[in-house]
C-alpha cells in the first residue's frame, strides 16, 4: 500500500510539473524553445557525450539572447527573474565561446553545460514563486 501511495504521488508531481512547464512555455515561447535545445544537449552530456552541445552551442546562445532580449511575461517579471535571465544568457554565451574556441576539455564543456542547466532550473524555480516584485 505504501508503495502505491509513493507511485501515485510521484506520478501526480510529475504531471503537475509537466502542466506547469507547458503553461510557462506557453506564456514564454522563447524560453520553451531554449529548453528544447538545452534538453537535447544536456542529457547526452550526463553520459559524457558532448557532440550535441558542440553542434548546438550557437543555437543555445542565440535562444538565450532572444529570451533575454524580449520582455519577460508579466506573471514572471520580477527582479530575481530578470537577474537570472541575464545570467542564463551569460552562461549560454560562455558555453558557445568555449565550444567555438575548441580548446576546452570535455570535462570543462560538461561542467559549463551543467552550470548553464542549473541556471535554467533557477528560472523554472522562480517561475513557481509568488510574483509580487514587479519593478
What are these regions (language model features)?
Residues 45-48, 102-107:
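Short helix-adjacent coil turns
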Residues 30-37, 56-63, 87-94, 119:
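Amphipathic, well-ordered alpha-helical segments in soluble domains
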